[in-house]
Amino acid sequence: MPELPEVEVTRRGIEPYVSGRKVERVEVRTPALRWPIPADLAKTLRGRVVRKVERRGKYLLFEIDAGWFIVHLGMTGTLRVLRHVPHPPAAAKHDHVDWIFDEFILRYRDPRRFGAVLWHPREAGDVLEHPLLAGLGVEPFSPAFSGALMHRLTRGRKVSVKQALLAGEIVVGVGNIYASESLFRAGIRPATAAGRVSLVRYDLLADAVRVTLAAAIEKGGSTLRDFVGSNGESGYFQLDYFVYDRAGLPCRVCGTPIKQIVQGQRSTYFCPTCQR
């Protein structure tokens, strides 16, 4: 699943091609994604200019004068920029939506169709008030995210520290891959109860989350199965994993074999020596 780095890489890749440009038309080939695409979306967006593209957690927010269309990549979604002059590229089986601009097509592809394309009209209020966004935690690169915040919000909680990271109620965008990698950098075992982690260790974890996500964005994200950036290129951060998907291999720091456990039906990887 695309996590925050992959979504941010996508945002940075597509914004120069769509920001300030007029949507000439929209072609919806598959209206039934995770939720139905609004039937009048193509009519609503025709002739509108995209003001900017922002990210909130794993959601991409495209602002026009009348509101925002929201894109979530789900498990296997990608957004690619394709040149359609002089000849538009043919759509493949899993290419569900095209936003067509003067020279480029923004194409949404999603083999498993767990993603979403939604509409939030301006009269409904700020887009951050949308039900899918209103309850999200803080952004990991914002000043609001800190070890003190995590420490305060986890007091008395028995859920594991990894599950607390994944929940998205404290900090957004940290999925399974980057939770495992961040906990390794912070030296914290993923099964440790969130309420038992000290403030000092949460300070280390907050720094580790920021460092891990920034490094992943710099490498274009992780490509394990489906993810490619807006230009069709794969990310390379998976080559730098310390623990994720490395069960049985030696720790890059101490040489101890990496262990794999299951938490909440997801695989978790850690070094039993470096993480305590």
From Swiss-Prot:
Its EC number is 3.2.2.23, 4.2.99.18. PROSITE patterns: FPG_CAT, ZF_FPG_1, ZF_FPG_2. GO terms for molecular function: 8-oxo-7,8-dihydroguanine DNA N-glycosylase activity; class I DNA-(apurinic or apyrimidinic site) endonuclease activity; damaged DNA binding; zinc ion binding. It catalyses: Hydrolysis of DNA containing ring-opened 7-methylguanine residues, releasing 2,6-diamino-4-hydroxy-5-(N-methyl)formamidopyrimidine; 2'-deoxyribonucleotide-(2'-deoxyribose 5'-phosphate)-2'-deoxyribonucleotide-DNA = a 3'-end 2'-deoxyribonucleotide-(2,3-dehydro-2,3-deoxyribose 5'-phosphate)-DNA + a 5'-end 5'-phospho-2'-deoxyribonucleoside-DNA + H(+). The keyword Manganese does not apply. Keywords: DNA damage, DNA repair, DNA-binding, Glycosidase, Hydrolase, Lyase, Metal-binding, Multifunctional enzyme, Zinc, Zinc-finger. One of its GO terms (biological process) is base-excision repair. Its cofactor is Zn(2+). Binds 1 zinc ion per subunit. Transmembrane segments: none annotated. It holds the Pfam family H2TH. DNA binds at residues 94, 112, 157. A zinc finger (FPG-type) spans 242-276. The active site is at 2 (schiff-base intermediate with dna), 3 (proton donor), 58 (proton donor), 266 (proton donor). Monomer. Belongs to the FPG family. Involved in base excision repair of DNA damaged by oxidation or by mutagenic agents. Acts as a DNA glycosylase that recognizes and removes damaged bases. Has a preference for oxidized purines, such as 7,8-dihydro-8-oxoguanine (8-oxoG). Has AP (apurinic/apyrimidinic) lyase activity and introduces nicks in the DNA strand. Cleaves the DNA backbone by beta-delta elimination to generate a single-strand break at the site of the removed base with both 3'- and 5'-phosphates. This is Formamidopyrimidine-DNA glycosylase. It comes from Paraburkholderia xenovorans (strain LB400). The lineage of its organism: Bacteria, Pseudomonadati, Pseudomonadota, Betaproteobacteria, Burkholderiales. The gene is mutM.
